[in-house]
């Protein structure tokens, strides 16, 4: 992204946005590195995306970002799928303060809880896209971290999502059921 920002005139569209657009994403959430270049870079990236950004724990204090907390998508067969997104709130720990100007990243679990509750009566299936990982070893339950950076197990166990799509740890989770929530994480 830094190279792109320094050479914007070479590309008509942000190259990462172009790749995601080619994939045909309908919905996506923000990741921790999306904040690395400040508000304007994030705004331009999001405006270049064809899909809808869902991130319930990011508040846009500048009013220019196309971010929604959740959406309800009705499939051709009539099934209503409620989708939300959240990003690890450890963005507040890692990110340079100037890159978070005009933004507020709130508690990921509380935002997921609010979204899950709000979607309850609006849809048949609830999905959470969580840019964060698992705080436990999934086979043994051994705690990997209690820092709060990764809370996928807590989300799966305490909230009523049907599907939890995670990403952040760069470890493959091909699929596991946790307290009635099916969870996956790409490598």
PLM regions and their residue ranges:
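Acidic, metal/ion-coordinating pockets
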Residues: 1-187
